[in-house]
């Protein structure tokens, strides 16, 4: 016969049935309990003690629990690991409950909906995706800031790139996505996939500026958030449409290879452009700066508007210093507003709001003192919100704690009734002190004192040796080993007055605070607008600080121009890491008639750094930053495409060469004459002749059909002859100094092709064995003594012959052809060389 389930456990099972994919935290008194598999799994993940309910039964129920006051910490751990957590609260006072206490889930916390991200200034985006008629709609939201946007995309790769750039951790996927696409999100991108199949009619978004698909996906996202959060979300901003074509387009591979916001080694901020440019002082400014780097501008007027203000801040050191001090006093207004909306704001949050608002007049004053036209718009948008700051300053005590149940929140003078209760408490304390002194005098018991505990209330404490002196009007409350506790009618009367005052004071103070929280909600929109203005000011002062610190100059950007002229350019991040004195600057010149720069030179000589330097300079200029150069004249680029180094493909487990070709194809298909293309060693992932042929064909295609400004680094020195056939291609190389058998890489870009690759020298630096290096040098000399055909590479119709061996060499040649040297380890390369030697 099956064991009977208790009403409490049946209630748990009924609730759990509605949240099968979440850990259910079930409030029972002072603990949140977990049962069954949730308990087993949570005990392991959170290192909790696993116990059991009904231990003596045949099937004890696994159980684990966490104290209610520490629950947030445990919830954060689960959410950080990608789990959902449903929180079931007691919906009535257990003391007043008839039968089982009513319980219900009040919130489902997920990786994409958590707002308690106090230790991070980063956005926490939740994304929804849908697909219809060959178009994808993508909407994203940050519940912690209220940001809510939507766009439409034509390719799945663009969807993947957008999600990766947003660093989203959870997606709400439509049923129109196929299984392979869902696997990309779940397995390759490690995203939590949630569903929202129904959209309540009252949550349907129908904005005229959005397509039907955009309205649908934004509605789906809103419905999911409402369903999981179960509360008013007044801080959510109206959904805003955006187009990726309105910004400098860069796919995720480009952002990753250029290390804009995350480094490749650790996927962290250090050593990135974001790290370099971040001198922001507010959390909102930090988030906005990251979004600027992710989405540089393509409107020259908008770029110049930013640069004008950067220039003003750069020219006024003392005013900027005062501005920075004022910004330091501004807390995270966006997240504070969200906490108010969520009903999670505590007294300290309101003090932070008031302190933040108190710094706004100073910021406004400094902008006014600068008296510059470009600052007028920002100055006019600085809303001091005096009504809110006045309300908080009059209501909240400067010494208020983080909790709302311990009292001491509301200032004296804010509420007359509360002041009366507090006066009663203060009088009661003096009454008790007077009563204690009077009874000591009357009874002659010098050790008599009045104490308090929850069980006995107020009582007279009298030791065993003094019991004979206890007066008749005392009555016994409790007997201890060495003392006894007594009460009196007068003490009881004082206690009743004090307890009533304390209880009513606590209740009234709580109600007053909740009223303040509700009243503050009407200012959320103004707080969010203020936050955006302060964030923009913060970003611009940050760019000016970096420009001053690093010695940057204001670039000249010209609409419609195709001239690139950078004098003394530097790689911004490399220079910051290694120091300006050690960095070798380079000019970058692509005149009107030059579209392609073919770059040759040995490994480790600086080709990749040179190309990345150019891309970063363009990005910096188009976010409104000054740039690392002596002078810089640039066109406005509409997109940057890169193929730099081997990288993983988010969409599938493709080979390095397949990734190379896919990224090259993406650039070829999407680039325009206003784009920047950077190809580093394209074609190295396959056999030599295949790679060379493809590299040449790609160069010719870009030259003849696209006309984009292109930097193309290659080890195929044969390609340098292309400058004779292609009018818009120039050769440059990295200069080297060869002296007494030693080679020094000068890291300087010079006109013309390289005459040597110095691969053996690089191998020497890498520490390959000396016998191997000597053998390689002999082979190289033999190869160099065999002249190549004089005909231009551009006109070749058949595969080049690198060298001639003996009549029995065909087997060796085939071995070399089949070998993909780029994918060989050092050990494999060494073994292969010795194998070839033995065959000669």
Swiss-Prot record:
SUPFAM superfamilies: DNA repair protein MutS, domain I, DNA repair protein MutS, domain II, DNA repair protein MutS, domain III, P-loop containing nucleoside triphosphate hydrolases
Family label: Belongs to the DNA mismatch repair MutS family.
Alphabetized PROSITE patterns for the sequence: DNA_MISMATCH_REPAIR_2 (PS00486)
Protein name: DNA mismatch repair protein MutS
PANTHER family on file: DNA MISMATCH REPAIR PROTEIN MSH1, MITOCHONDRIAL, DNA MISMATCH REPAIR PROTEIN MUTS FAMILY MEMBER
Origin: domain of life: Bacteria
Gene Ontology cellular component terms for the protein in this record: cytosol
